[in-house]
Amino acid sequence: MNFVISQHFNEIKYRFLYIFFTFLLCFIICTIYSESIMFFYVHPLINLTSMQGKHLIFTEMSEAFHTYIFLCFFTSIYCTFPYFFYQFWAFFIPSTYQFERLQLRFLSFFFFTLLFFSCIIIYFIILPEIWSFFLHFEKKSYYFNLQLEARISSYIQFTFQIFSYFFVLFQCPLFTHFSLNLNLLTISFLVNSRKYIYFLFLILAAFLSPPDILSQFFLFSLIVFMYELCVFYSCFYDSLRERIKTF
């Protein structure tokens, strides 16, 4: 018994070492190509402004250095996550039944699909809309000029916050699946509470998006679509579970 436990702990240790060295390698590569990675995150703003006479600034001696480290660190985490997931899968999957493996494969595919589409929508739609709204406050008049000179640290941190918020939002169908499995949610609750939940979504859209009607409507529509997708999935999942019980 002790031998088996020690084997498991040794395997966990080795897998965490693999993950650590993979993260370290990703961090080194990100550090080498940090300027290209910075351009990737700044690109939505560059497309809107063409950066004519504009520039990103840093107001403290070490601010640019800390921003590059922050950027490389979190980019390395995102790049290492699929490998971490693989190591997690390889450790736990031998102890599961066949039906559990099929379910985990479906959930894994579902998770990474939502993750991929959330990245695409955030980068190409949501971020440009947010920056476009804030850039409308630039003014050139006879009395004064008001122009954007964004701090690089504020820009990068705000961009990562937007990514984090919408990553969580796009995983709502997955959260719904686990809640249904644990009997924390029911289909009747999701359907009967729809109007109250829509009202909460409206407040959430007003909080997350800029105070622009089109942006708020777009975000509200996106959240409602995700909610209706959760309701549809819960109905499908419940009917599938009932069919399995009958066999």
UniProtKB/Swiss-Prot annotation:
Coiled coil: none annotated. It comes from the Eukaryota. It is a multi-pass membrane protein. Keywords: Membrane, Mitochondrion, Transmembrane, Transmembrane helix. Pfam families: TatC (PF00902). GO terms for cellular component: mitochondrial membrane; TAT protein transport complex. GO terms for biological process: intracellular protein transmembrane transport; protein transport by the Tat complex. InterPro entries: Sec-indep_translocase_CS, TatC. It is found in: Mitochondrion membrane. The chain crosses the membrane at residues 19-39, 73-93, 106-126, 155-175, 196-216, 217-237. PANTHER family: SEC-INDEPENDENT PROTEIN TRANSLOCASE PROTEIN TATC (PTHR30371), SEC-INDEPENDENT PROTEIN TRANSLOCASE PROTEIN TATC, CHLOROPLASTIC-RELATED (PTHR30371:SF0). Belongs to the TatC family. This is Uncharacterized tatC-like protein ymf16. It comes from Nephroselmis olivacea (Green alga).
